Amino acid sequence: MKKLLCAASFGIALAFSVGAQAADKIAVVNVGEIFQQLPAREAVVKQLENEFKNRASELQRMETDLQSKIQKLQRDGSTMKSSERTNLEKEVMAKREEFAKKAQAFEQDHRRREMEERNKILSRIQDAIKVVAGKEGYDVVIDANAVAYSVSGKNITTSVLKQVK
């Protein structure tokens, strides 16, 4: 009898807990759309272009210089003295390695800075989502890309976009 009473009370408690979970207010937000529509994103792109402009032009200059030396080697290599040809080949190899190192460092630095700025913007979006969810009384907010179906009335993307701007 005691076991039956315990099992029945456990079943009732389980039924009520499922009902309580269903009462959560859930909203959907499209973070990617907000990110694309922010004016701050375009400002960051221009800022990064200005920040890396000098290094990019230096890499272009190095590439042009390297290409001219390679063309000279291909064009005049057969008529050069062997010592001149060897020196030019060594110079081309050294410049090619230097260019590759600088290009790789440039790409890594650019990617790192891009991620830093992207994370700042995403942090602002996350803060705005928390504010809007708190104002409108939502318990759970899910990214629209992770949802197969949602009711359009539960989409808070425009409210979050207004909050971020």
From Swiss-Prot:
One Gene Ontology biological process: protein stabilization
Listed GO CC annotations: cytosol; periplasmic space
Name this polypeptide is given: Chaperone protein Skp
SUPFAM superfamilies per the UniProt record, alphabetical: OmpH-like
Pfam families documented for this protein: OmpH
InterPro entries named in the record: Chaperone_Skp (IPR005632), Skp_dom_sf (IPR024930)
Extent of the signal sequence: 1-22
SMART domains: OmpH
Assembly mode: Homotrimer.
Function: Molecular chaperone that interacts specifically with outer membrane proteins, thus maintaining the solubility of early folding intermediates during passage through the periplasm.
Gene Ontology MF term list: unfolded protein binding
Gene: skp
Location(s) in or outside the cell: Periplasm
Keywords: Chaperone, Periplasm, Signal
Family: Belongs to the Skp family.
Keyword flag Chaperone: yes
Stretch list, region Lipopolysaccharide binding: 102-113
